[in-house]
Amino acid sequence: MSIENNKASVKKVVLAYSGGLDTSAIIPWLKETYDNCEIVAFCADVGQGEAELEGLHEKAIASGASECYIVDLKEELVADYIYPTIATGAIYEGTYLLGTSMARPIIAKAQVEVARKVGADAVCHGCTGKGNDQVRFEGCFAALAPDLTVIAPWREWSMVSREDLLDYLAERNIKTTASATKIYSRDANAWHISHEGGELEDPWNEPSKEVWTMTVAPEDAPDEPEYVSVEMEAGRITKVNGQSYTPYGALMALNEIAGAHGVGRIDITENRLVGMKSRGCYETPGGTVMFAALRAIEELVLDKTSREWREQVGAKMAHLVYDGRWFTPLCESLLGASQPLANLLNGEVVLKLYKGQAQAVKKRSPNSLYSEEFATFGEDEVYNQKDAEGFIRLYSLASRIRALNVK
């Protein structure tokens, strides 16, 4: 089918809508470009905050949408996407806790569900042609709804700047509160907020204080440390400071506590899926505490080979999530294979929060393999130190044979 015939066949589109400048311009552009098709706006509430959602329905209708669905995904995001991912030990390139990446599959899934509900024949996103998100969304669409047409305006239209978008809306008498002077590109959800653009595009520039919005600057954090207790069952946080929470509630509580101490800031230059490098500043206060607590319990309960395997799975899982491959057999397999070890992650960790750091200082687990009796340097009745001699001879046998062959 030709591009023009394909455009003529699109009658109803579900747009991933944020209310920002880009998606506000996309609504009239779709109607003009796709033969006055019907536009249904869809917004995923993934914990980006009430300010981002306020007036969204009215704004979408004013821009030309026939309907606007705001779907609450907060609990599902944390319970079904974030917890399973971090329980594998996934962390991208050693530092990034995958905040944006983990939210994309659930948003795409919900968008497809709305499309099915309203009988749409196309879905649309506002991702740029240079970023990772276009691949993530469209990879999910391909896995969940290959029959739907996917529209990516940034790969079609001629507009290249915020000024172009503002002029486009002004010509059509569509009001917007956006300005041409927006400095940073931000993306927020319950797990984190990302910051890109502005002075951050030069890696020689230190991020200004205006970049950070979710955490206190470590140097301005309290001069006294705060201790926070985290309890978990099967790798899922169930209590914070002795109080029971839902998965989302626990994350919100830790975000507030850790953010006040400047915990969870990173400034990285990462390898994008599309081939280029990009610099991003990320704030993940509660997630940083959760990840540290999980690692602390892992140290107690997992034997050496289990931890080695877990590190390999975590590295692969991080790339799958980052690359938008959530709805794939391999991702499903890794999540399933990781669960038996995750089931062992029960216990309590006390973390010391101070000036940007979250340090596990106490930990205990009913599944702990650590024994003070075995580990002590004093005498015990279980471990005979003389037994180590035979073990060492066998362990080093290959090295011994190699050395003898050289002679």
UniProtKB/Swiss-Prot annotation:
A single GO cellular-component term on record: cytoplasm
InterPro entries in the cross-refs: Arginosuc_syn_C, Arginosuc_syn_N, Arginosuc_synth, Arginosuc_synth_CS, Arginosuc_synth_type_1_subfam, AS_cat/multimer_dom_body, Rossmann-like_a/b/a_fold
Gene Ontology MF term list: argininosuccinate synthase activity; ATP binding
Pathway where it operates: Amino-acid biosynthesis; L-arginine biosynthesis; L-arginine from L-ornithine and carbamoyl phosphate: step 2/3
Residues holding L-aspartate: 128, 132-133
Any Pfam family matching the protein: Arginosuc_syn_C
UniProt entry keywords in alphabetical sequence: Amino-acid biosynthesis, Arginine biosynthesis, ATP-binding, Cytoplasm, Ligase, Nucleotide-binding
BP-aspect Gene Ontology terms: argininosuccinate metabolic process; L-arginine biosynthetic process; urea cycle
Enzyme Commission designation: 6.3.4.5
Residues binding L-citrulline, per UniProt: 96, 101, 132, 136, 185, 194, 270, 282
Family matches, as Gene3D superfamilies: Argininosuccinate synthetase, chain A, domain 2 (3.90.1260.10), HUPs (3.40.50.620), Single helix bin (1.20.5.470)
Entry's localization field: Cytoplasm
Catalytic activity: L-citrulline + L-aspartate + ATP = 2-(N(omega)-L-arginino)succinate + AMP + diphosphate + H(+)
Positions of ATP binding: 16-24, 44, 126
EC class name: ligase
Assembly: Homotetramer.
Similarity comment text for this entry: Belongs to the argininosuccinate synthase family. Type 1 subfamily.
Name the UniProt record assigns to this protein: Argininosuccinate synthase
Organism: Shewanella loihica (strain ATCC BAA-1088 / PV-4)
Lineage: Bacteria, Pseudomonadati, Pseudomonadota, Gammaproteobacteria, Alteromonadales
